């Protein structure tokens, strides 16, 4: 049932993306060709020699942490020394960034908003952010899901950090992956160094929350972030023009939203 749900999720995301990119006055076949070409280029980028080499390095580093005492030592330090009511509150506020049921409709809405208001700077920027986020998820989710089970890692509350291939499905943090995507795609469109650095830091918050809540080891959160970074790099390889206006995800009361930022 879980595999079926995942498949339906990816198929639905592809269909939604196709509708999002459809332009007024063009036939559906043209829109499908456009999205097929765009996504195929994203996949070509992700499975290129350079990206796969970077992915392998990330997997190797995560494995080094998981299969030694380092992961559990980090977890113990966070739980015994760093975690408190304040970190729990922050963690609770950033956790929704990793909830696909909340964020994917937000990205789709941003993409649709961009299509209807593409002649305005705000509309085009919002649309690009939404589409890039959807594309990053579409290209990064399959390898992330595979690595979750292939590594066989378990949660801190369940077992040790060591990898036991196909024994469990928590070797990569899905929340860390999903929570990093909107910040990373926004960072790709920012030229201001301070804004870019702030967004990169923001992309790590959801992964950190999983460590704080004792739901994932450091290596699992880090690997989820790394897959998101590589996927966002491929989804954001276009649209490199300078931007003073960017759209970033924002946590609001009882939900998620987006915030437009104009910097000078």
Task: For each feature predicted by the language model, list its residue ranges.
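Perimembrane loop-to-helix junctions flanking transmembrane segments
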Residues: 78-91
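Alpha-helical transmembrane segments of multi-pass membrane proteins
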Residues: 61-72
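Membrane-proximal stem/loop segments at transmembrane-domain junctions that anchor or position
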Residues: 55, 76-79
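Acidic side chains
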Residues: 42, 71-75, 88
């Amino acid at each position: 049932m879980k595999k079926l749900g995942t498949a339906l999720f990816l198929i639905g995301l592809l269909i939604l993306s196709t509708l999002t990119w459809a332009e007024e006055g063009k036939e559906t076949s043209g829109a499908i060709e456009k999205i097929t070409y765009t996504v195929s280029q994203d996949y070509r980028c992700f499975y290129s020699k350079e990206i796969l080499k970077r992915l392998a390095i990330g997997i190797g580093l995560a494995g080094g942490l998981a299969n030694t005492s380092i992961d559990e030592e980090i977890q113990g330090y966070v739980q015994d020394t760093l975690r408190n009511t304040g970190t729990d509150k922050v963690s609770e506020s950033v956790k929704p960034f990793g909830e696909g049921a909340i964020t994917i409709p937000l990205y789709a809405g941003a993409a649709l908003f961009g299509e209807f208001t593409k002649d305005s700077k705000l509309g085009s920027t919002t649309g690009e952010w939404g589409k890039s986020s959807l594309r990053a998820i579409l290209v990064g989710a399959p390898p992330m899901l595979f690595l979750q089970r292939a590594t066989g890692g378990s949660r801190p509350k369940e077992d040790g950090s060591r990898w036991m291939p196909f024994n469990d499905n928590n070797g990569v943090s899905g929340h860390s992956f999903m929570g990093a995507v909107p910040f990373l795609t926004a960072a790709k469109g920012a030229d201001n160094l301070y804004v870019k650095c702030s967004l990169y830091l923001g992309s790590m918050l959801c992964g950190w929350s999983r460590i704080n809540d004792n739901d994932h080891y450091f290596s699992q959160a880090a690997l989820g972030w790394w897959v998101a970074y590589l996927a966002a790099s491929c989804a954001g390889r276009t649209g490199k023009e300078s931007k003073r206006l960017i759209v970033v995800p924002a946590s609001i009361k009882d939900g998620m939203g987006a915030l437009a930022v104009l910097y000078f």
